Amino acid sequence: HLSIRRQRQMCIRDSSNEAEWHTFKNNKNNEAFIDRVYIVKVPYCLRVTEEMQIYEKLLRNSSLRDAHCAPDTLHMLAQFSTLTRLKEPENSSIYSKMRVYDGENLKDVDPHAKSMQEYHDMAGVDEGMNGLSTRFAFKILSKVFNYDHSEVAANPVHLIHVLEQRIDQEQFPQERQEQYRRFIKEYLVPRYVEFIGKEIQTAYLESYSEYGQNIFDRYVTYADFWIQDQEFRDPDTGEIFDRQALNEDLEKIEKPAGISNPKDFRNEVVNFVLRARANNHGKNPSWLSYQKLRDVIEKKMFSNTEDLLPVISFNAKGSEDDQRKHNNFVQRMVSRGYTEKQVRLLSEWYLRVRKAQ
């Protein structure tokens, strides 16, 4: 009788970093074992959203789970980590590539952005096998939480400082050091200036709602008289504005928003307000009711750093009204996810950056 003996087969799964694997592979004593190894290369995470989710999970299971983390901190770290893992594309920004990988559609934002498949094809099969690990990133995050000895909390400004320090300390090759610094300077910092600016702007404008309404009412009045080619007499001061003077004042409001066709814009605004008055007992609507003009007014109110100081800065206030507006601003920022100490740090950082620009 022919006896068939069936052997039981076993599969052992293990994971290793690329460097350790090459050390093991280059050892001739392991040749027989290596012949029985099937390699599955698993790249680092290349999607910012998923990288953030990893950090959130790690934080939930750590002693930092109850520590305060300011908005955009994890997002900034995830962006930096992801950028270090991507291959630089040709004729396109690596930052745009990162955003496309994360599922964003940049058709109307960046004409040089390519499709995800095009980026994949250009990068080759080993994209994501190099760059900073999630473990390294979490060590960075831990240092950020402990950057300020008086408050266990993390924020993007401290994250930038820690990243810059670590880049110098790690002694990366010169080319990689320069690349990582470029990521911070060209992508992370400008994007965060925009982000924190919008955060501050929202809290600031809520403290100046009456001021916004005054600008709205004045703009509508001036635009209406300008369209009709009539002089306007200020009822409070008696000052007379001819069409040229009206145009100059309207342009002061429009200029920060870059209105390219003021004639059409003014007609559009006045027509909207006239229709709205019919349903509002003849009164102007809220300055928040018409998004296009609201955007213009917000840019006007936020265009001069000096105008922000009474509300945003933490210096002694010249009046009780300024102090009240400042307190309201701080509380609104706290409600958006910041500690009071972070509000001061980030506001002062933002004002310095704005002043330097």
Features from the language model and the residues they span:
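Intrinsically disordered, low-complexity regions enriched in Pro/Ser/Thr/Gly and acidic residues
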Residues: 134, 142-146
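Conserved AAA+ ATPase small/helical "lid" subdomain
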Residues: 41, 46-137
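A short beta-strand-to-loop transition that corresponds to the Sensor-1 phosphate-sensing loop
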Residues: 13-25, 43-46
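Terminal-proximal interaction/regulatory segments of ATP-powered molecular machines
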Residues: 147-357
